[in-house]
Amino acid sequence: MGKPTGFMEYKREVSVAEDPKKRIQHFNEFHEHLPKEKQRLQGARCMECGVPFCQSGMMICGMASGCPLHNLVPEWNDLVYTGNWQQAYNRLKKTNNFPEFTSRVCPALCEAACTCGLNGDPVSTKENEYAIIENAYSEGYAAAKPPVVRTGKKVAVIGSGPSGLAAADLLNQRGHQVTVSERSDRVGGLLMYGIPNMKLEKQIIDRKIAIMKKEGVTFVTGTDIGKDIKASKLLHDFDRVVLACGASNPRDINAPGRDARGIYFAVDFLKANTKSLLDSNFEDKKYVETKGKNVVIIGGGDTGNDCVGTSIRHGAKSVTQIEMMPKAPDKRAENNPWPEWPKVCKTDYGQEEAIAVYGQDPRIYESTVKEFIKDKNGSLKAVKIVKLSWEKDPATGRMKMQEIAGSEQILDAEIVLIAAGFLGSQKYITDAFGVELNERTNVKTAPGKYQTSVENVFVTGDMHRGQSLVVWAIREGREAAHAVDESLMGYSNLVIQ
């Protein structure tokens, strides 16, 4: 511990976000990060606890407390403070294949479990992670390191999201020849087309993919396995197959008027927006235009928030976000103690921008869609919503929602974006391989395992555990790589945590 009194001497400092009214003029990342010396002092705030909950990654009451990757947080925080940036990078990379992604899009489970945050402000671990990886790139020691020896084994990874990339990266490091297939035109999966550019600039993904290519990973884009190439051919050509196709089947809203023109799934809306941005800087007009339109977003999660920010950047007349659940408390409740994940109300970047532009929070809580209202031409013109009440079912103990009679409200809407989550993977890919599914329509495996019901076929990521965070996807990819390696070699020397 380089500075035992650091948490008392230095206040928490984090990057500064650009003013909302300025940042909505562009689609770039909008945080100004601390200078290197100031960031170094933030490392001194880490207490190097005897029991570092920040890296525990344990489940408490169904939620993760601490980093699921078990990042060696106290170690590299101290190395940042002492100026050993390269060693900090080495320790960070030991558990995390892609700190350039997690330092941008992770909700920082580590900080929520930080002991320093129990009676004060937590260590700015996410910002330290960002500084470590970006310094590694600028100093040149994040360069490609191809494996010295090849095993002669071939592995196909289907899907290039965070889980597929993590599995591919580790399997390639082990010496296996890895080919990653991606059905889209660009590598990255969720990272590329599911997360807007202002949260994760796509050049960051391209930068890492270029390194993986130099290390020997082969990427094939525009290829839809199960349609363009049969599963049987893949199983013939490769020793093992890893399914990493994500949970890409969006949950729909079954309400009258659903066939109205102007209703889109959020995933399609965000993909079209990013693709148009990258292809032509929006000149091709191949995105959903929200300029001058009333936009209603169904869903209160991260994807819904991304839709808020994207719609505002295109000049929406109004943006409303519908959330089924009650508003969370502003402060942690007594029955939600540290180190549990704090169930408190958070205002994300898109909602901040809506407040700045429209003068009010876009969220309407405890509500659901009752009807999509069409004009005479079949286009959407309004949405009818109704308020909900939540009560505990005495028989099951679960919360049960009920519509409140007479609480209907009409919202003007020419565009509706459905961000209501996902219901497993696309059926054609699971059918193509004949893998067994569980009751949640995820690919079934034994608990804690990654081998599917089909010989030589493994699964990882959201396709395995259901819709989740990027950090969980990376952990799944690492563990799946270990399982694949063990099945190929009879043992595995991959260090996954």
Task: Give, region by region, the residue ranges found by the protein language model.
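Immediate flanking context of iron-sulfur cluster ligation sites
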Residues: 4, 31-61, 85-109
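C-terminal catalytic lobe of FAD-dependent flavoproteins
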Residues: 4, 12-37, 42-45, 373, ...
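Beta1-alpha1 glycine-rich phosphate/pyrophosphate-binding loop at the start
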Residues: 5-32, 41-44, 68-82, 89-92, ...
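Feature captures the FAD/FMN-dependent oxidoreductase FAD-binding
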Residues: 87, 149, 154-158, 206-255, ...
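Glycine-rich dinucleotide-binding loop and its adjacent helix/turn
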Residues: 131-149, 207-227, 250-314, 437-453
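Glycine-rich Rossmann-fold phosphate-binding loop(s) that bind the pyrophosphate
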Residues: 159-162, 299-301, 462
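FAD-site-proximal beta/loop scaffold in flavoenzymes
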Residues: 261-292, 391-467
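A conserved FAD-binding loop/helix module that cradles the flavin
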Residues: 304-307, 314, 460-494
